Amino acid sequence: RWDPWCTISGYHGVTSVVLGNCGFGFAPVAKEFRERSMLTMTRTEAIPFDSMKEGMDWDWETIPEYLDSLDRIPKGVNVIQYMPTASLMTYVMGLEKAKAGEPASDSERKEMARLLHEGMDAGLCGFSIQRLGPDSVQADYDGSPMVTDIMCDDDILNLAEVLAERDDGFIQITQGTGDIRADIAFLEILAEAAQRPILHNVVAPARQDPEVHRRPLRWIDGCREKGLPIYAQCGTGRAGFAFTLEHWNLYDASPAWRAVTTGTKEEKIEKMRDPELRQALMAEAEEADRRLQVIQAGVGGNPKSLVVQGVNRQADLQEFVGKSVGDIAEAEGKHHIEVMLDLSLRGDLNVEFLGPDKGSNAEFMAEMMNE
């Protein structure tokens, strides 16, 4: 809506996109929940709130109305849409109950199934989920888990049964609760229940160890041999993440980082100056790094390895460009977390960091794509 050309996709030669990944979207959305849903997108995807507010005319509430609206506007790419499960749950259950992690009632499950049927009749391709547990690496605007992060198995299987009944559609799921055996077991249960393709996020290569991507691919091969239609979505990006602390949430597996990076820009600045919160970040640094390694979606990596890429066009910070946070910390005799926070504050949270390029092994990428 704020970019009908889907510019970033087009820049990379993508001509068709699927909207609503990871369970979040803008329909169905009650009128009084519109602004809250935009705040969620601001937090999770760094889309400026003002851009959304100006670019979205909100001439819909339901999925059929949204798809009709999407059909009317000019677009630069082809699009299809998932049912965003977080939006569906909030619409039916209310935010408070959905956020509490309570299972849906029988009547709520029936209504969610009805709305999924209705949406697929109107053109949806299936439904999507992000389930990353209470310490989700990608939290909501207020720092709480996304609705689907703490969604129970039975509520997901209720939607899977809709696809099985229709023999139509597919499921995109990012499942990473920290218990890999339980996660794998649930994906197999989900595939058995739906009997429709499951798009598993994400298989990503390391630079040197091929077992990092071969292990999950062997599991997927085994699933296919059992008749379970599970497919891997593979990460083949050739660069690390570039980000500023004004818009960054992929350290959310760390409660200390989550506390500091939620709220308005002014609130974030105040928190980053707070001695107690800074100390909590430093004290939790090793634990945060461990969690980010366990939860694969923690793509930012260890803050020590981040490289300063942009400094808000400030001449007084230019000397830091091209240096790693760890090297700056060693030179200044400071903790690397202090360096990251201090540079960000000096640059009005617009200092840009570049994460490590963890997957640029062309041989491994080709192996995944040709599997």
What are these regions, as identified by a protein language model?
Residues 2-127:
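Divalent-metal coordination cores built from histidine and acidic residues
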Residues 96-103, 116-120, 124-255:
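Functional cores that coordinate and move charged inorganic groups
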Residues 4, 57-61, 65, 74, ...:
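Conserved active-site and cofactor/substrate-binding residues in soluble primary-metabolism enzymes
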Residues 37-56, 155-162, 229, 259-262:
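Short, basic, helix/turn surface patches
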Residues 67-74, 116, 120, 160-167, ...:
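Structural signal for hydrophobic packing residues in well-ordered secondary-structure cores
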Residues 52-56, 102-106, 145-150, 173-180, ...:
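Hydrophobic alpha-helical scaffolding
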Residues 223-227, 231-363, 367, 371:
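Hard-cation-handling environments
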Residues 15-17, 77-81, 125-126, 169-170, ...:
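Structural motif
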